């Protein structure tokens, strides 16, 4: 009888760390999209998740340039620090950036301002029309499953119909990291390369890689006011109202979106280590703690996704 003996060579037994495994998965997804699609685009707002996506895309194709265009839906109520960071990064890497302006749609009479002043729900029309105009067939987004329940059930490759609408019943199985990008003319696929990352993973990776972030993510003094339990930034977008009082507090932002619906959190975390410690101790997701637009209804995010939102 022949006996086969398995020989293990420690030199070839390298085990990927948790962060290395997540990075490898994301890099694979970027390369898969580059091979399957003709006109991919990365949604890039200058927020931490889109910054992470761009960093991973740069790694996936280095030393060649990133073969994707960037797209930002500008509400006109974005944080100035984040826009400045966005423009600096685009210039630094010689990237192409398309900006779809909500203000342009309001000026043209295609959209109306909401009574509460927020423009976050108004992003859907500029986004979907930009996708149609530029014929993008794959759209990278920074959504993560730990953020919100609608995002938790969405696939990495998320098929959208010719109206950019999402139907959860049309989702495809994704066994063994095999992704099906097939779509009919006029349809496109939303792609979420960091879907399996948590907020803590994101920050630990940012620390490991030495990725620069806008200062808004670290504790600083800011003039804010309280609305429905959230500390919102005072500004030109229409806040605060007459009965709302502003005060100066030391805060930071866990997630960044429209100023009118993104709440700051009290914090003294001025370094990456301090932020990571703070997040590890938190029992609330970043969107659950700081996004007013997710509190409009129990299914607010899923309703917007069905209409074409990120």
Predicted regions and their residues:
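Nucleotide-activated chemistry modules centered on ATP-dependent adenylation/adenylyltransferase
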Residues: 1-310
């Amino acid at each position: 009888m022949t006996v086969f003996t398995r020989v293990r060579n420690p030199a070839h037994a390298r085990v990927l760390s948790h962060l290395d495994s997540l990075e490898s998965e994301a890099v694979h997804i970027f390369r898969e999209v580059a091979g399957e699609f003709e006109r991919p685009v990365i949604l890039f707002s200058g927020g931490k998740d889109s910054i992470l996506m761009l960093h991973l895309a740069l790694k996936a194709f280095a030393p060649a340039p990133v073969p994707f265009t960037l797209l930002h839906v500008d509400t006109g109520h974005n944080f100035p620090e984040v826009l400045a960071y966005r423009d600096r990064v685009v210039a630094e890497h010689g990237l192409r950036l398309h900006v779809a302006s909500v203000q342009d749609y309001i000026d043209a009479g295609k959209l109306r301002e909401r009574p509460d002043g927020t423009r976050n729900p108004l992003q859907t029309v500029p986004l979907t029309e930009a996708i149609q105009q530029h014929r993008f067939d794959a759209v990278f987004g920074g959504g993560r499953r730990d953020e919100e329940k609608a995002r938790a059930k969405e696939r990495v490759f998320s098929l959208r119909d010719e109206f950019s609408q999402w139907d959860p019943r049309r989702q495809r199985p994704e066994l063994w990291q095999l992704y099906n990008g097939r779509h009919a003319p006029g349809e496109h696929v939303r792609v979420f390369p960091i879907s399996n990352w948590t907020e803590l993973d994101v920050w630990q990776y940012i620390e490991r890689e030495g990725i620069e972030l806008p200062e808004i993510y670290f504790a600083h003094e800011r003039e804010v006011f309280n609305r429905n339990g959230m500390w919102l930034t005072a500004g030109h977008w229409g806040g605060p109202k007459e009965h709302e009082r502003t005060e100066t507090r030391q805060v930071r932002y866990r997630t960044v979106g429209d100023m009118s619906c993104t709440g700051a959190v009290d914090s003294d975390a001025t370094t990456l280590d301090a932020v990571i410690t703070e997040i590890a101790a938190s029992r609330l997701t970043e969107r659950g703690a700081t996004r007013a637009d997710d509190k409009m209804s129990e299914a607010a995010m899923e309703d917007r996704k069905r209409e074409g939102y990120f």
